[in-house]
Swiss-Prot record:
The modification Cysteine amide is found at residue 92. This is Toxin Tbo-IT2. The presence of a 'disulfide through disulfide knot' structurally defines this protein as a knottin. Negative results: does not show effect on transient receptor potential cation channels (rTRPV1, mTRPV2, hTRPV3, and rTRPA1). Does not show effect and insect and arachnid sodium channels (BgNav, DmNav, and VdNav), as well as on mammals sodium channels (Nav1.4/SCN4A, Nav1.6/SCN8A, and Nav1.7/SCN9A). Does not show effect on insect and mammal potassium channels (Shaker, Kv1.1/KCNA1, Kv1.2/KCNA2, Kv1.3/KCNA3, Kv1.4/KCNA4, Kv1.5/KCNA5, Kv1.6/KCNA8, Kv2.1/KCNB1, Kv3.1/KCNC1, Kv4.3/KCND3, and Kv10.1/KCNH1), and on calcium channels Cav3.1/CACNA1G. This recombinant (non-amidated) toxin shows insecticidal activity on larvae of the housefly Musca domestica and has no activity on a panel of expressed neuronal receptors and ion channels. It comes from the Eukaryota. Residues 1-23 form the signal peptide. It is found in: Secreted. Keywords: Amidation, Disulfide bond, Secreted, Signal. GO terms for cellular component: extracellular region. Residues 24-53 form a propeptide. Gene3D superfamilies: Agouti domain. The keyword NADP does not apply.
Length: 95
């Protein structure tokens, strides 16, 4: 293989891995039965089964451990308006 082919192959593999990681955040089997509310009440999470105790992306949160998958809880400069957002490949697995 030439260097150009090798580099192109590595880029394609990297993109495929990134797409697979991002798809994990969008697919939540528990969410197929019932759509989540716009503003999630943290107290109501305790009444649900263990598997669905996470907040999906773009929903309000208070800490990163509440967010599903590789999402992290990000707030604005003043520590308000916190939402679960994609943490990227680096944040995946860290809570």
């Amino acid at each position: 293989m030439t260097m150009k082919t090798l580099c192109l192959s590595l880029i394609v593999i990297g993109v495929l891995i990134l797409v697979a990681v991002k798809a994990e955040d969008y697919v939540n089997i528990n969410s197929l039965e019932e759509a989540p509310e716009e503003n999630v009440n943290i107290n109501n999470l305790e009444e649900t089964p263990e598997e669905s105790r996470c907040i999906q992306r773009h929903r309000s949160c208070r800490k990163s451990s509440e967010c599903c998958g590789c999402s992290v809880c990000q707030c604005n400069l003043f520590g308000q308006n916190c939402q679960c957002k994609s943490g990227g490949l680096i944040a995946c697995g860290k809570k």
